[in-house]
């Protein structure tokens, strides 16, 4: 008789661990008695049609359906192999694992009550042949630390944005420094601006209009090349104003103010890039402080006092130093607030006005202290 009920093939490519039966009488396999079949070669080909009928089980009633197997491609469930000592078999328990659930009709037999599937030497117990396909699947790379969610394209765009902002800022500061140098060291120019004060108000009007357009018109400041044209007009007008203010101070005071401003701004920018503290979360406090400083400036117009002006200039320099730290962190993109890479003109404008205000307040402190 064919040994069709020896094992079930339903995704398992491994033969049963039992060796072939030796010749001679075969002891019955409890609780089901198999007809002796000497010299049966193992493993048997699965589900081969057999010319022999399948007898029922002679030993008592069984909770499992009896009778021969129908001839057809119906997979049968595996029989649990209990730890029964057999003649010709190695003594020991043979735990038989449950078969993986596949897209095949399953046997009505109860699942195997025994533990883990059998693992042959040299095989990985975690391999798919010995695992549960219902719980296993392709590895997910979304939660894998080896595949972070950081987009390298975004990083490169952000770095290019920072380089562009500092390039524009460098050009602006170069124009302003050149203008201040001319207004400070050339006596003819210094005398002209002192005699024609009205040019200061004209440049202030041009600066104010350019500042309003670039600050309030988002579409305009992102439209190339008009955004650069407006920024150039603003830089030229503000440079003229700064140079005219510097012409009313001593040359020594102007040089000291330039040096102190350079040191302060460089330190603040480096610190803002390296620190973990988020200065952008303090934007509301800085705006309120700006309103208070504006009221203080109106008070200084009507009360002409040297000490009061030094205090006002000190508070203004401190406030715009904080604004410089905030505007620097807005470029990085890893804080609570950040600027879009398209806003390089607006970012350069913020940094430029911060540095110019720091310079003017420091120049006021030095000039009033020397009087």
UniProtKB/Swiss-Prot annotation:
It comes from the Eukaryota. Residues 1-145 are annotated as: Disordered. GO terms for cellular component: endoplasmic reticulum; Golgi apparatus; Golgi membrane; membrane. Residues 14-49, 102-114 have a biased composition (Pro residues). The chain crosses the membrane at residues 165-185, 197-217, 228-248, 253-273, 283-303, 307-327, 346-366. One of its GO terms (molecular function) is calcium channel activity. Keywords: Membrane, Transmembrane, Transmembrane helix. InterPro entries: Bax_inhibitor_1-related. It is a multi-pass membrane protein. GO terms for biological process: apoptotic signaling pathway; endoplasmic reticulum calcium ion homeostasis; negative regulation of endoplasmic reticulum stress-induced intrinsic apoptotic signaling pathway; negative regulation of extrinsic apoptotic signaling pathway via death domain receptors; negative regulation of neuron apoptotic process. Belongs to the BI1 family. LFG subfamily. This is Protein lifeguard 1. It comes from Homo sapiens. The gene is GRINA.
